[in-house]
Amino acid sequence: MAEPWGNELASAAARGDLEQLTSLLQNNVNVNAQNGFGRTALQVMKLGNPEIARRLLLRGANPNLKDGTGFAVIHDAARAGFLDTVQALLEFQADVNIEDNEGNLPLHLAAKEGHLPVVEFLMKHTACNVGHRNHKGDTAFDLARFYGRNEVISLMEANGVGGATSLQ
């Protein structure tokens, strides 16, 4: 059910309208208010605009809320390859090991889509569970291999991931 200001706040975030977003936040609206589709402003924000994320997070937006499809914002940002947004979310305690409804971590989604900078950051600068298997039994390495993401495969192999740690 939509909450007061949920639609306006979500709309401003989705458009990347910092001016309207700031105005609404200054009026102390509930930053975790849901819009008519049951999603928060953080969940519908323009992913390529980490400043939107930071403003919402500074006001207490919960980076680990999942939407109706089981995705947290970090899943969406990793899948879309928005490294700056992933970093902003992690600055505010987004869970790097949060699972979606299929058991995928953000690393799985970034590897599947071939987003090398996101994969590299998650592997080298977070406590990401690189060997985690989703509900189908696949690791991020398995998905990178299945989808032919050769740069991701090379990076993972260079960091000791793959081979015996993944399905053959």
Curated annotation (Swiss-Prot):
SUPFAM superfamilies in UniProt: Ankyrin repeat
GO biological process, one term: cell population proliferation
Gene3D superfamilies hit by this protein: Ankyrin repeat-containing domain
Mapped ANK repeat ranges: 4-33, 37-65, 69-98, 102-132, 136-165
Keywords of the record: ANK repeat, Cell cycle, Repeat
Gene Ontology CC: one annotated term: cytoplasm
The UniProt record lists the keyword ATP-binding: no
InterPro entries: Ank_Repeat/CDKN_Inhibitor, Ankyrin_rpt, Ankyrin_rpt-contain_sf
PROSITE patterns per record: ANK_REP_REGION, ANK_REPEAT
Gene Ontology MF annotations: cyclin-dependent protein serine/threonine kinase inhibitor activity; protein kinase binding
Keyword Transferase (UniProt): no
Subunit structure: Heterodimer of p18 with CDK6.
Homology family: Belongs to the CDKN2 cyclin-dependent kinase inhibitor family.
Function: Interacts strongly with CDK6, weakly with CDK4. Inhibits cell growth and proliferation with a correlated dependence on endogenous retinoblastoma protein RB.
Identification of the protein by name: Cyclin-dependent kinase 4 inhibitor C
Organism for this UniProt entry: Mus musculus (Mouse)
Annotated gene: Cdkn2c
